[in-house]
Curated annotation (Swiss-Prot):
Belongs to the uracil-DNA glycosylase (UDG) superfamily. UNG family. Keywords: Cytoplasm, DNA damage, DNA repair, Hydrolase. It is found in: Cytoplasm. This is Uracil-DNA glycosylase. One of its GO terms (biological process) is base-excision repair, AP site formation via deaminated base removal. HAMAP family: UDG. Its main location: cytoplasm. The lineage of its organism: Bacteria, Pseudomonadati, Pseudomonadota, Gammaproteobacteria, Enterobacterales.
Length: 227
């Protein structure tokens, strides 16, 4: 049987739950009070818009969005074109240079082309106050993203989960290892990348798994949108 569950179905189900209504209300109240919240309201659910549930091939978990101006746009680790590449993504590019033959470090951090190929770039908290890292951690987003991971676990087969750092690894503890391929490494941040993120070869391992299971490999070279 073909599973036709979509993110629209999952989100509609969550929106009926009191915790999620409360989460959305708290974020709306922050914006209404004049606080700057990232990403902009229209971008909060971009990961779901760009990577449909039925097309998820790889999941990369982040934590909360970048909290500087013009950075966050709803995809974990990604920044808008024209913004300096953040340190963790610089380290991801360094790893890609050594892991993927022919990869050349791009001069931008815009990862939408990954998302369109089936790489779910999911932050575990989807909003943040400007300049205040982890400021929305208690808003209920973690419950929502637990349920998102559970939906991928249940409705997809053979997804590669790249879990970097203790937070992502704890978050991914519910994943069925018999149905999905789970890879662990330290976080790519400058604080921990040298403890085993560099040399982990997760990007090539993900592609090998996908091709061995009848899926197309990911082109990890991020593309800017055509002008």
């Amino acid at each position: 049987m073909v599973n036709t569950m979509t993110w629209h179905d999952v989100l509609a189900e969550e929106k009926e739950k009191p915790y999620f209504r409360n989460t959305l209300a708290r974020v709306a109240a922050e914006r209404a009070a004049g606080k700057t919240v990232y990403p902009p309201q229209t971008d909060v659910f971009n990961a779901f818009r760009l990577t449909e549930l039925g097309g998820v091939k790889v999941v990369i978990l982040g934590q909360d969005p970048y909290h500087g101006p013009n950075q966050a746009h709803g995809l974990a680790f990604s920044v808008l074109p024209g913004v300096p590449v953040p340190p963790s993504l610089v380290n991801m590019y360094k790893e890609l240079v050594t892991d993927i033959p022919g990869f050349e470090r791009p001069n931008h951090g815009f990862l939408e082309s990954w998302a369109r190929q089936g790489v779910m770039l999911l932050n575990t908290v989807l909003t943040v106050e400007a300049g205040q890292a982890h400021s929305h951690v208690k808003f209920g987003w973690e419950t929502f993203t637990d349920n998102v991971i559970a939906a991928i676990n249940q409705h997809r087969e053979g997804v590669v989960f790249l879990l970097w750092g203790a937070h992502a690894q704890k978050k991914g503890s519910i994943i069925d290892r018999k149905r999905h391929h789970v890879l662990h490494a330290p976080h790519p941040s400058p604080l921990s990348a040298h403890r085993g993120f560099f040399g982990s070869a997760h990007f090539s391992q993900a592609n090998r798994w996908l091709t061995e299971h009848g899926e197309s490999a990911i082109d990890w070279m991020p593309q800017l949108p055509a002008r």
